[in-house]
């Protein structure tokens, strides 16, 4: 019957396939040195893949190249966090030596090293209207955290963070506030604040000791509470070491107008200030230029930089810089994000936490060694809680370095 013959053919073919398969299995068995089957070994685990982590950053209008606030934030993400440096419009690997040379001695033991897998994504803001769309663009690109650099991004960070609760955000220099101005927190937003008044106090104390005509100057950017902390600390520091000194105070009204900074700097030097401290973002580059030109013309004047060590801009003119370690705040957030430890809330960094300090004093002036010793004594008192630094000029005692515009 056709059905029986078909069944027989299927049976024969199946048997042949089975024999062939068994033979191949025997041939495929690994053998030991004596020709015997090798003993079974545990499977080799594949090397773990480096977890990719995109971290985004939105600058304020000062942007990259301000040699100050934004550049400090970029250093914390790009160099310290990712081990990268920007060159020719693209990232290149930075050497360990390049990272090390940006760390002051007090940071050498904090274990700062690139975080494996971090890729920076940076968007520069030309106008304030760029802040919110830039932050949202970072979220759309899949970043694990979006960083808003500066208090001017507060509203944008708040809006985008509420819209995207699964994305982490880092806000520098501001807390979130409700409609009544009361601070509050979101679970996906870390705010990093600094005790600028403490670092400003130290450079003010140094300015008071370095001044020869008892007249120093302060240049602020926008006249807002944040910059008032710089002014208050500086004036208190001057008064602590040189009660006879007068502090000339002026504001440029911006953070991105180098020409305005230079004009105000020239004005203060003309009025007799021989040490000028600026807290004015990119405007401060103009202040430094004004003092540099005054020194070239024979005037014994100094300038004090801010946020980053600005001595490279005018080595002979920069007395020191008040270091506000935005880079440290950014780096610690990147590290915590990678370790799954980033939580919402406010973090404040002062002298005790390494968040503020002053740069090495590379220039010479009479009494330098004694001046630095005095400044360090004042630092110790602040860290120990024995000396409280005012956070607003209204808190200064009546006798403390009266300000003149």
Label every model-predicted segment.
Residues 18-21:
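C-terminal motif of bacterial Sec signal peptides marking the signal peptidase cleavage site
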Residues 23-405:
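A residue-level marker of the well-folded mature domains of exported/periplasmic proteins
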